[in-house]
């Protein structure tokens, strides 16, 4: 156990355009090498593309996509005796959002569209409809937890 105090959680300021804290946090996930202006351009560009294609509030679609990606349970490795078990555990809300954002950005980067804004828009729309690589990742994690349900008594 660390002997130092736990670092205080820093509040993320709301994003300037939509006034959403979760969107500001998402921009930080998109950001590479501290280039926040580039990340903002990518995210706002993606939301504009979503608005063009769906003719509805892009922030609602973004939140719907995050809900579709966020896992409810995951597995953690637990060593008992000489064996390592994959123990299913519930995911706390802050980690749910963090995982959802990470998966969304990772799978958007792997897509084939030309610009990152287009890739992100495509992944957002797919996730909001319950398809796409990020949603598949969530289903895989849930399937893994279901398969290892027998070890759930090895709680942390």
Swiss-Prot record:
GO terms for molecular function: rRNA binding; structural constituent of ribosome; tRNA binding. Keywords: Ribonucleoprotein, Ribosomal protein, RNA-binding, rRNA-binding, tRNA-binding. The gene is rpsG. Part of the 30S ribosomal subunit. Contacts proteins S9 and S11. One of the primary rRNA binding proteins, it binds directly to 16S rRNA where it nucleates assembly of the head domain of the 30S subunit. Is located at the subunit interface close to the decoding center, probably blocks exit of the E-site tRNA. Gene3D superfamilies: Ribosomal protein S7 domain. It holds the Pfam family Ribosomal_S7. It comes from Pseudomonas fluorescens (strain SBW25). This is Small ribosomal subunit protein uS7. One of its GO terms (cellular component) is small ribosomal subunit. Belongs to the universal ribosomal protein uS7 family. The keyword Ribonucleoprotein applies.
């Amino acid at each position: 156990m660390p002997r130092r105090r736990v670092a205080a959680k820093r509040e993320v300021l709301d994003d300037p355009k939509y006034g959403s804290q979760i969107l500001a946090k998402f921009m930080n996930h998109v950001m590479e090498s501290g280039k926040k202006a580039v990340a903002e351009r990518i995210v706002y560009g993606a939301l504009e593309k979503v608005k063009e294609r769906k003719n509805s509030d892009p922030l609602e679609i973004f939140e719907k996509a995050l809900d579709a990606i966020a896992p409810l349970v995951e597995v953690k490795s637990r060593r008992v005796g000489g064996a390592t078990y994959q123990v299913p555990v519930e995911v706390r809300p802050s980690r749910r959002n963090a995982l959802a954002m990470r998966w969304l950005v990772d799978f958007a980067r792997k897509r084939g569209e030309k610009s990152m804004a287009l890739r992100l828009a495509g992944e957002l729309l797919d996730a909001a409809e319950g398809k796409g690589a990020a949603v598949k990742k969530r289903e895989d994690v849930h399937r893994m937890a279901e398969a290892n349900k027998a070890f759930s008594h090895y709680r942390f």
